[in-house]
Design a protein with these regions (language model features):
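N-terminal glycine-/serine-/threonine-rich beta1-alpha1-beta2 phosphate-ribose binding loop
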Residues: 1-97
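ADP-ribose/adenylate-binding Rossmann-like module
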Residues: 82, 94-115
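Active-site-lining helix/loop region of Rossmann-like oxidoreductase modules
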Residues: 10, 152-278, 295, 302, ...
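Alpha-helical support elements that line or immediately flank enzyme active sites
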Residues: 142-154
Length: 331
């Protein structure tokens, strides 16, 4: 094994490309290959595809096996899909190839609430391979779970946790603006909601992680998603939104224990939503309130995924979460 950690970037969408760029600039990490099924990317130089401005002498491969036929690797940084039914086979493939995994798949961050059988399959595959899998990101992975859990370290008692995240999506990347429903009619928004493909992915995972880590049994989980409508015509670099159309969403999740509500998470992401901000309120002994004045989700997701690589390499085999690792830092 070389001194540098050899990384394969699996998925070259906007986040994957940003991760790859960050790997290239980080000391102690080496980008040895990339995978993407997009025929417009396959075969091209990675530096060109990720917008690096220079050649890396690596061609984008269509398959992981094609990468590993040319080089050895230690870790895969996986950035393809949010949903277990779409990414599980990819994760199993990576593990069977003998690589540790850091993934930005939201449903992998704490999957035992909604996907217990699939989580058990991934965990078993990781243990068979002697490798580690982590799902992380800014949210889930930090703002609404790892951060409030870390803050409870200075509490003698925790009665209730409330986290509110507000994102002004006007200057965010196009796929994110699309993800929150920008430019949709209310009817189209509701139809996509009914199909289970609208709304922020990861709130159930965050609620479950907080409950489980603090030793509470999650008796009931409830969530609501509603569109945020434009009161006037809006335009971004990616969308034109008419008055009355959707400019974003508000999603609220509630986790109840035997004594009532214990966790409340509010996620608001909309065009022209005002000041970005993340607020954690803990009721207990003592009461705490911490506000971050705007966490850029794209930058933070890239950072935490890359920063987690060393922790994952040192972790025992299996499917792990952010609460299982030593504190992830910028080194």
């Amino acid at each position: 094994m070389t001194d540098e950690i050899r990384i394969v970037q699996y998925g070259l969408g906007p986040i994957g490309a940003a991760v790859a760029r960050h790997i290239v600039e980080r000391e102690g990490l080496e980008l040895v290959g990339t995978v993407d099924i997009d025929p417009n990317k396959a075969g091209k130089d990675v530096g060109e595809v990720i917008g690096l401005g220079r050649s890396l002498g690596l061609a984008v491969a269509k398959t992981l096996s094609a990468v590993l036929s040319q080089t050895e690797a230690d870790v895969a940084l996986h950035t393809t899909s949010s949903y277990f039914d779409l990414f599980q086979s990819q994760v199993i493939e990576i593990l069977e190839a003998g690589l540790d995994i850091v993934s930005t798949a939201e449903e992998l961050s704490f999957p035992w609430l909604d996907h217990p059988e699939a989580a058990a399959e991934v965990d078993a595959a990781a243990r068979r391979a002697g490798k580690t899998v982590l799902g992380t990101g800014v949210n889930p992975g930090f703002i609404m779970d790892a951060l409030p859990l870390f803050l409870t370290a200075i509490c003698q008692r925790v009665d209730h946790i409330e986290v509110t995240r507000v994102i002004n999506a006007s200057k965010r990347r196009g796929p994110f603006q699309a993800k929150i429903g920008s430019g949709m009619t209310v009817e189209a928004f509701e139809a996509k909601m009914a199909a289970g493909r609208m709304g922020h992915v990861g709130l159930p995972e965050s609620v479950a992680m907080v409950f489980d880590t603090l030793g509470h049994k999650l008796v009931r989980y409830e969530s609501t998603v509603e569109p945020v409508l434009a009161e006037r015509d809006l335009k971004t670099d990616h969308f034109e939104v008419r008055a009355g159309q959707v400019r974003g969403l508000k999603q609220v999740a509630h986790g109840y224990g035997k004594d009532g509500e214990f966790v409340a998470l509010t996620f608001i992401a909309a065009l022209e939503a005002g000041q970005d901000g993340d607020t954690v309120k803990i009721s207990g002994k003592p009461d705490l309130e911490v506000t971050l004045k705007g966490t850029n989700g794209d930058i933070a997701t890239v950072a935490i995924a890359v920063n987690a690589v060393r922790r994952v390499q040192a972790a025992p085999p299996g499917l792990v979460t952010m609460r299982d690792l030593p504190i992830v830092t910028a080194r």
